[in-house]
Regions:
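His/acidic/aromatic-lined binding-pocket segments of jelly-roll/cupin-type domains
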Residues: 87-88, 96, 118-121, 159-160, ...
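Histidine-centered metal-chelating micro-motifs
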Residues: 105-106, 167-177, 184, 192-193, ...
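C-terminal amphipathic alpha-helical segment
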Residues: 195-270
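Short beta-strand segments in beta-sandwich/barrel cores
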Residues: 261-262, 278-283
Length: 289
């Protein structure tokens, strides 16, 4: 195997901005690009290899071809030919909807799908940009529905003004929303299931409001209240600092100032590198980039 690169899958959205195209140095005239799916095994939205002998193969093709060699023995035993993670960049010019994602058991029961635990890493943020994560006070499922109906659900959500480098872990069941001006990297389980709770009563280009999933979301929500929903860490020059470790992924951040060497020979898994700022080159032991 050699270091694999993938073609981005660009998604135009109602709320998309203009940061993704220049951030990725892409030659595209697309407007309102809200998401760039960097690595995806989602059906009908599969990433395509952009380099090397396997150029043109989809991620699903690669998993079928290389099996444990690509994803590791434990991952292949657990997920088979389904790639378990979805990596995105998200650029919000407007507030995204208030939403929640189901956990594995509920997603399997309702959709025959994985659940959706995820995390955010803030790449960039306009002045005053905010993220919402979790409840700021205890509410019941009945109160939740009442607040959705009377447009006050945002009053009981915890808001954070953000800056580059901020991290939030979002286990399935945690209500959340990305605010206008936020540009983030999102690491998540391979699932595109979203229960939209509140959408600020906005309308699309055809004058229609988007469907809400009030009752589906009510059963999926974890109503627990935490003191702080942010992930605290301190970056260390040229050393990995762990951000999140959960049953679905482990993430670390490198604040790089010089060339580093990483030995993954004993790791029974794949590794994904995301460059958040500046530029970098990745080479394997044979000099392949």
């Amino acid at each position: 195997m050699y270091p694999l690169k993938f073609e981005p899958i660009l998604k135009q959205t109602l709320w998309g901005g203009d940061k993704i195209i220049p951030f990725k140095h892409l030659n595209s005239d697309l407007k309102g690009v809200g998401e760039s799916w960097e690595i995806s095994g989602v059906e009908d939205n599969e990433s395509v290899v952009a380099n090397g002998p396997d150029k043109g193969l989809t991620l699903a093709d690669m998993v079928r071809k290389y099996r444990e060699e690509l994803v590791g023995e434990a991952n292949y035993a657990r997920f088979g030919n389904k790639f378990p993670l979805l990596i995105k960049f998200i650029d919000a010019k407007q507030d995204l909807s208030i939403q929640v994602h189901p956990a594995d058991d509920l997603a399997k029961k309702r959709h025959n799908s994985m659940g959706k635990t995820e995390m955010w890493y803030v790449v960039d943020a306009d002045k005053g940009a905010k993220l919402r994560s979790g409840f700021s006070e205890q509410i019941t499922p009945k109160e939740y529905k009442e607040r959705v109906l009377n447009n006050t659900i945002t009053d009981v959500l915890q808001e954070y003004e953000i800056k580059p480098g901020d991290v939030f872990f979002l286990p399935a069941g945690r209500v959340h929303s990305i605010g206008a001006g936020a540009f983030i990297a999102e690491i998540q389980q391979t699932s595109d299931i979203t229960y939209r709770i509140y959408d600020f009563n906005r309308k699309d280009a055809n004058g229609k409001t988007r469907e809400l999933h009030t009752d589906l979301a009510r059963e999926a929500i974890n109503y627990e209240v935490l003191d702080d929903y942010r992930t605290k860490y301190e970056a260390v020059k040229d050393e990995p600092v762990e951000l999140v470790a959960c049953p679905y992924f482990t993430t670390s951040v490198y604040d790089m100032t010089e060339e580093i060497s990483c030995d993954y020979s004993e790791l029974d898994s794949f590794v994904i590198f995301i460059c958040m700022e500046g530029a970098c080159k990745i080479k394997d032991n044979e000099g392949n980039e």
